[in-house]
């Protein structure tokens, strides 16, 4: 039924008194209460808040996708102006009508493109399907339009990409495909739900700029859901702050950042890690935590030395890791991925060395190679004077007691069929360290040490939040009293407050137990806060390494400067210079089998500060 007289001029979407609830144990649990907002054509409205605040369920309610998940939605008004300028009440549309609205008039970009794309269809088929459904195009016409959309989202060699499957693309490329699919029918409203949270800073910057450019070209209203205030400052016109299912503050981006009224908004802004906040400081510093009572209160800094002088606990020399690629009629190895090329570094007890770089730079492969989770083709890995790379499997298992791993996704790291108590006890059983009674006491102590309760040991992983699951993984890593912990993107996808809690916990554990961390991350603001030293990786090689203060305050390599320049700044008045929106993905690190890559030569530019010499930077400078 048309409602053209009820939608204010300029608005493309209007919502009044939206209420969302779910049934749990025969009780109605409210997720969103009395939420009202509007969106103008060509405007970006950022909806911000922590996990559980109701951001994503609001988006799903607008798309009418909650009913399938058992959501109970009530709303006085939910009006959408379609591309045809017809105004419809979304809550009155049938399932068949909504299938025509979704994609054609409203589109959504989800946080994780790999789970949003169908793994058994090519990229081209998936984009073309939406075009054929909503524009009545033939298959050939749809594929031509799909190629045009890939060009529009600045994907190079679009014709080739059309025939590839999602797993064959990088994370940033998959997210661009999702954007192309969402925009293929030129919707009136685009909902972007955390589309850049787990992306590298350079890819994130490209995606944000891409959305702004396409929004301007299509005069499209955008709802951008995020918990990253730096992203909000860069992309938003207006901001809606949500807390525990309610809108607590709304206003222009300048009002929210420069004159926040609600204590939660002030606390959210105070908790944002600011790049450059560690200027002049030598040691890691705790994050301030979100507090409604004391929103501006800073956590006490850690200004004490934890690094132990003497011999390094871990020494890596000329590490090489390559992965074979097979092709041809005989399925022979013809090419190799040069994931890690002649990487060398030391790690001292009580030190945090951060490995930073974009996806594909070799950070995670380096971390996995240290534990021989992937086999290396060359180099030496020496732990406490003993070579790891030549150990037999039996001796390697004993050594793994001293080196533990924390993975990015805690839910995937925990067995859903085991209680968390059993998950934490498992490494103790494998190594035969403690009998049952003592192991149970150890589990209770570990849970308390990471801020959980001993009775949580009887629960299962799905009963915990993301931050709590990451604490459980940390407790399991601590069970064996390791000397080194490798944390691979351990806080990348966590909310700002949960991320601060986990980083503070890691710093406390380092202070108390002298643990050395190899911290793998692309979040430069977090790296600045936690690190003693930083190593920058590019195409499998370290191009800059040194004390955190030297690398951040005086970056020498152009790639390091690029990473720092791409970090979103939580200040609307500081707009990042406009980029040329060409593909900025890493050049290929795939080479013919047997082909050698010249190793970078590092030059000392300061105490402990080494940078790739100019002649070693040809690949970067050529881009």
Curated annotation (Swiss-Prot):
GO biological process: peptide transport; transmembrane transport
KW Hydrolase (keyword) present: yes
Domain ABC transporter per the UniProt entry, residue ranges: 15-269, 314-564
Record keywords: ATP-binding, Cell inner membrane, Cell membrane, Hydrolase, Membrane, Nucleotide-binding, Repeat, Translocase, Transport
Family: Belongs to the ABC transporter superfamily. Glutathione importer (TC 3.A.1.5.11) family.
Main location class: membrane
Membrane topology note: Peripheral membrane protein
EC number(s) given by UniProt: 7.4.2.10
A GO cellular component annotation in the UniProt record: plasma membrane
Signal sequence region: none
GO molecular function terms listed in the Swiss-Prot or TrEMBL record: ATP binding; ATP hydrolysis activity
The protein, known as: Glutathione import ATP-binding protein GsiA
Subcellular localization: Cell inner membrane
Cross-referenced CDD domains: ABC_NikE_OppD_transporters
Highest taxon of source: Bacteria
Function statement: Part of the ABC transporter complex GsiABCD involved in glutathione import. Responsible for energy coupling to the transport system.
Catalytic reactions of this protein: glutathione(out) + ATP + H2O = glutathione(in) + ADP + phosphate + H(+)
Species per Swiss-Prot/TrEMBL record: Shigella sonnei (strain Ss046)
Keyword 4Fe-4S attributed: no
Enzyme class: translocase
Pfam families noted in UniProt: ABC_tran, oligo_HPY
Sites where the protein binds ATP: 49-56, 357-364
Subunit structure: The complex is composed of two ATP-binding proteins (GsiA), two transmembrane proteins (GsiC and GsiD) and a solute-binding protein (GsiB).
Database matches in SMART domains: AAA
